[in-house]
Curated annotation (Swiss-Prot):
Lignin degradation enzyme. The lineage of its organism: Bacteria, Pseudomonadati, Pseudomonadota, Alphaproteobacteria, Sphingomonadales. Belongs to the GST superfamily. It holds the Pfam family GST_C. Residues 89-257 form the GST C-terminal domain. It comes from Sphingobium sp. (strain NBRC 103272 / SYK-6). This is Protein LigF.
Length: 257
């Protein structure tokens, strides 16, 4: 049995299957795809996922894409390994999937758009105008992604950013409403609902960040306690610590090369 996860590391959508692999205690090879080098658009990676997007899971010659789908796949294939991440009760499992659907269709998108506007801009501006257009037209297969790259380079409309910040506020309020009453998003315990939402919410609480006014101990104590609770889990701590070591080793090897 061979598992390889191609990802950007422990953040955003890449964190979902990465955390799931650690929670399940599965052996796997982590393959870092470097967005600063546009590796997700490279020919070698598009042989793995023709859409040029991470994460992607390689399992004995078969490739599974889409972050939440990968998480469910790992639970389906390895139900007895490590921690169970889906409620046994069908109704509670449905509740879990309402949360994973919501994060994929709403919460992730508003946070992602703001991340693209402010975090991806420097990467998108590394090339000349001519080089950028050639790269986007030749190597980015999805029209919607082409548009996002152009907006990241040239600037997102302010009214769009205002709307996405509004949606972040709505998202944070929904999470706080639930997490002020219970430890996890589904009251039967920790599940993929938590992993998938944690992947997007973790970091929003950083003081001085874009979202510090939305997520803090005063305004969202339940959400902050939930973030602390998940960050304290042994599997999550191992994920972050091992990823830091691998990143440091990679940087050292690049300096030697």
């Amino acid at each position: 049995m061979t598992l390889k996860l191609y990802s950007f590391g422990p953040g955003a959508n890449s964190l979902k299957p990465l955390a799931t692999l650690y929670e399940k205690g599965l052996e796997f090879e982590q393959v870092f795809v470097d967005p600063s080098k546009f590796e997700q658009h490279s020919d070698w990676f598009k042989k793995i996922n023709p859409r040029g997007q991470v994460p992607a899971l390689w399992h004995d010659g078969k490739v599974v894409t889409e972050s939440t789908v990968i998480c469910e796949y790992l639970e389906d294939v390895f139900p007895e390994s490590g921690n169970s991440l889906r409620p046994a009760d069908p109704f509670k499992r449905a509740e879990m999937r309402v949360w994973t659907k919501w994060v994929d269709e709403y919460f992730c998108w508003c946070v992602s758009t703001i991340g693209w506007a402010f975090g991806i801009k420097a990467i998108a501006q590394k090339m000349s105008d001519e080089e950028f257009e050639e790269h986007i037209n030749k190597n980015v297969p999805i029209p919607e992604q082409q548009l996002k790259w152009r907006r990241a380079r040239n600037g997102f409309p302010q009214e769009m950013l205002d709307e996405e910040f509004r949606k972040v506020g709505v998202s944070v309020a929904r999470l706080e409403e639930t997490l002020s009453k219970q430890d996890y998003l589904v009251d039967t315990g920790y599940s993929l609902a938590d992993i998938c939402n944690f992947a997007i919410a973790n970091g929003l609480q950083r003081p001085g960040g874009f979202f510090g006014d939305y997520v803090n101990q005063e305004k969202t104590p339940g959400l902050c306690a939930w973030l602390d609770r998940i960050n304290a889990r042994p599997a999550i701590k191992e994920m972050f610590e091992k990823s830091k070591r691998e990143d440091l080793l990679k940087r050292q090897n690049e300096k030697v090369a």
